[in-house]
Amino acid sequence: NPVIKNPGLRDFRDPKVMWYEPQKKWIMSLATKNNVTFYSSPDLKKWIKESDFGDGRGAHGGGWECPDLITLDDSGKQRWVLIVSLNPGGPNMGSATQYFVGDFDGKTFTSSQTATQWIDYGPDNYAGITWSNTGNRKIFIGWMSNWLYANLVPTEKWRNAMTLPRDLKLKHVGENIYLTSQPVSELSAIQSKPVTVHNVKVTASTDLSSKTGGVKFPCQLTLDMEEVKDFRLVLSNTAGEELIIGYDKKQNQYFIDRTKSGKTDFQKDFANRHVAPRLSDNGKMDISLIIDVSSVELFADEGLSAMTEIFFPNKPYTQIRLESGSNIVIKTMEYIALSAYN
């Protein structure tokens, strides 16, 4: 296997290779300390260094890893997106994955993006990459953990998992362009018949478990709201433990709070409340949650805001309730059990 000689860097790693059709050559994206270095080759044997990207761009709390250069459609125009993981330096501590929207000419990647953008604001989605040979789709999967505690989580016979595969797309909000992510449509293969409830009025606290005929994990729970208001979705068990997922209108942030979620004392930063900005300017709100026995993946506003979290309750969560001081109305609530273990 031909390899590129390391020029003397400690971090010279994670090659991702793609075919660049306009110039009939292969492009390799390589993590090189705090940058991504691009190499090209006509035959996968002889490689030429083309350029570096990273100085003064994005987050640099730690070394860059797992680069992935992809193209996505933007209303008929092709745009380039560079996905880069780093550890530490994430938006909610520890490891995380950022992205840059820009252009690539076969030699140099450029981006006018000034703010750091994250593919997932939760603490537990890292080192993700996309598949090849998926047609016009770009499908992404990440490692569902964080290097802050990956080797400390209280599990037996297994340690950590992967996120759901996600379809990546681009979406404009005002003058900004963002990368969205939503569960792949193939998830329908393990979905049961949906339980749909309309016009759910929520005052102080409303039990959703009774409205769905009981709760079984894993499941998919979707909420569509006509107004953007504060809410808290609480998963709880008979041990008094709870995981809280919600939206804070004043801060314009989604959040997941696992402070009292169960086993949390194995690492000092695990018990925490994590936040993600609401990027949408729509006056309506939609939220889709994939909830398993020890993880939740949140996709809000058609995937503009995403969060992934793991948790370790001492007893299974069996109840779901919705709380709000704003008298919200859930226009449509859909609960779907997933048969992943069958």
Question: Each predicted region: which residue ranges?
Answer:
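Short, solvent-exposed loop/turn segments at conserved positions within beta-propeller repeat blades
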Residues: 30-34, 91-96, 159
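Beta-rich accessory regions
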Residues: 75, 103-342
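Surface loop/turn signatures of beta-propeller and other carbohydrate-active proteins
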Residues: 1-19, 30, 48-71, 108-128, ...
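Short glycine/acidic-enriched loop and turn motifs that connect beta-strands
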Residues: 34-35, 87-90, 147-148
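Conserved Ser/Thr-centered positions that define the repeating blades of beta-propeller domains
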Residues: 38-44
